[in-house]
Amino acid sequence: MSRKAVSAGVSIETVTRVNFVCSMDDVAELLRQHDACTDRKPGRPLPRLEVLKRAAVILAVTAWESFVEDTVRNYASSAIEKASRPSDVHSLFNSVAQRWLEGKPKPPELADWTGNGWKGFLKNKLEKDLLALNSPNSENVRTLSKRYLGEDLTTRWHWERTTPMLATRRLDALIRLRGEVVHHGREAFNRTAAIQRKQVVEAISLLNHLVECTERVLGLAPIDIDT
């Protein structure tokens, strides 16, 4: 956990959240640079300024991806370490064991699961799954959270005027936008539509809400302590 000063005391936050906030500060700075160059005047900005909005979208999604990876890794690793028997993490254990058995292991290999050896298998599977995460969209977050956190986080993403279904749709739309920016970027003859400032602002708001919902569900929300 990390501590941050607040007006009436100290706020205790996870390091994962602090890292996310720092990354999103960079996103906000890119938007400020864009606004400073355009003076927020109506009309389409100069093409050379579009890079600021494209970079902001890429950084925002990268911050979200890192948050997902670190949250799943830290929460699952802690649960595995604290477990005294496989039944303490039965859902995760059964999932990994089933995959292992599908490989038709030889009898001598069963010895690797004895003692605390099973914990190593779970941790290795965790790292492989996180390494394979190439898109932090709702489907992948759903799969990871059900396997390693014990529930589908996407069903808990809701806030004022936003349902879980709407939240997942917006996230997936943002991920697709990031993909378009990464794979196409600035193309000749403007074959791809420019990113609107509004899209960057909405992305920042969406990801902040998703982080808040995720940490609240896992009992990791910031704690304010009066001093």
Where are these regions (language model features)?
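Generic hydrophobic-segment detector
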Residues: 46, 50-53, 107, 140, ...
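Intrinsic-disorder-associated interaction segments
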Residues: 9, 13, 20-23, 65, ...
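Solvent-exposed, non-transmembrane amphipathic alpha-helical segments
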Residues: 40, 44-47, 83-99, 191-194, ...
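Short runs of predominantly hydrophobic/aromatic residues within well-ordered alpha helices
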Residues: 53-60, 64, 68, 72, ...
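Polyanionic, low-complexity intrinsically disordered segments
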Residues: 3-36, 151-227
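Charged alpha-helical initiation segments
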Residues: 1-58, 72-75, 81-82, 86-91
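Helix-loop junctions and short alpha-helical segments
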Residues: 59-60, 67, 71-162
